[in-house]
Amino acid sequence: MGTAVPGCPSSVARLSVSVRSRGEFMLVVMKAQATEEQVRAVCQKIEKLGYRSHAMPGAQRTAIGVTGNKGEVEQGTLEEMPGVQEVIKVSKPYKLVSRDLKEDNTVIRFPGTSATIGGRGLAIVAGPCAIESREQAFAVAERVHHAGAQFFRGGAYKPRTSPYSFQGMGEEGLKIMAEIRQQYGMKIITEAIDNESLDLVEEYADMVQIGARNMQNFSLLKRAGRGKKPVLLKRGMSATLEEFLMAAEYILSEGNYNVALCERGVRTFADHTRNTLDLSLVPAVQRLSHLPIFVDPSHGTGKRNKVTPLSRAAVAVGADGLMVEVHNKPDEALSDGPQSLFPDQFDELMTQVRQIAAVVGRTVPEIGVRETVGASQ
C-alpha cells in the first residue's frame, strides 16, 4: 500500500497518476525510483490544474485517477516533471473502474472480521428476499450461517412492480438484521431504493445494495459514492457491459472505491426462466475491470431448481461471490418464493460450491460470532 505522502492520497515506489488531456484520460506513471517529494509534486501539480484525485493502491503501483476536468492540459506539462516515466492515454469511456488504471483486483475488507470480497476466498451472500418478521429472519440466518455464508442478505425496502405488493418492513427490518449480525457474525447486505432509504441503510448495514432497477439512477449512484459503506451494484435488466461499468464509474467518481458488481440476469426472448443469466459477463468484467463480481442465480433464473446448477457454473467460471435467496418456508414467502431455496437445498449447494471452488483455486472462508467485535455500523 505504501506510505501516504502529504498533498497526495497515497504513494509507493511506482505510481500512476491519471489526468484528462484534451478530453482524454491519461495515466502518469512514475519511475520506480521516484522519491516521495517527486510524487507529491506531481499530485500537487494536478490539484493546481483543478482536478480531483482518486488513489488506487496496488501491489506494484498506486494509481491516482484524476477527475473534474476544467480545461485542456498539455501532456508535456506532466511528462517533463522529475520522476515521471511516461504518460499513457486511456481511451475507454470508464476510467476509474478500468484495469488500465489499477492492475490488481480490488479486495473489499470489513472492519472486525476476516470476511472479504474479491480475494481468493469466495464470498457467499444468503438470506430471504425480504425480511418478513424477526422469527422468519432468524430462522433463515441460523441455517445459512451454519452452512457457511459470510454475508446475510434481506430486503428491508422492496422495489416491487406492483404498488400493492409487500414493500418491506423498513427500519424495523434493518434493526432485525443488525441483531442477526450481532448473533451470528455475518455481515449485512441490504438494498437502498432511494436517497432517503440509503441514509438509514448506511446506519445499519455493512454493504449497500443498489438493485437492477436503480442501476442508472445517477442521483442514487452519486449519493452512494459519497458514502463510506461498500456498494454492491446489480446489473440492469437490459444493460450492456459498458453501461454497467459506467454505472459503477459514477460511484467511484464520487470517492467510494469499495464497489462490487453483480450479474443477476437480463431480459431476453427466453421464457423457460424468469431472466437469462449471462455468465459470460464474469470473465468479460474481469478482463476489463479490477472490481469483484458476484452472480445472483436466484434472480438470474427465477426458478428454485435452476439455482444450484447455475451456482456451480458461476463458481466454475470465476465469480468472486454468490448471492442466493433462502427462505425457511418458500411457499409462504411474501416475495420471490419460487426462486428461494429451502435451507436443506442451500446446505447441499454449499457442499457442491466448496468442491468446485477448490478445483478453481478458491476457498470458502468461515466467519464466526467471535469476529463481530469492532464490526462497522
What feature does the model see in each segment?
Residues 101-104, 162-175, 196-197, 212-228, ...:
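Active-site-adjacent beta->alpha loops and helix N-cap segments on the catalytic face
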Residues 167-189, 224-230, 279-293, 339-361:
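Alpha-helix-loop-beta-strand connector modules within alpha/beta enzyme cores
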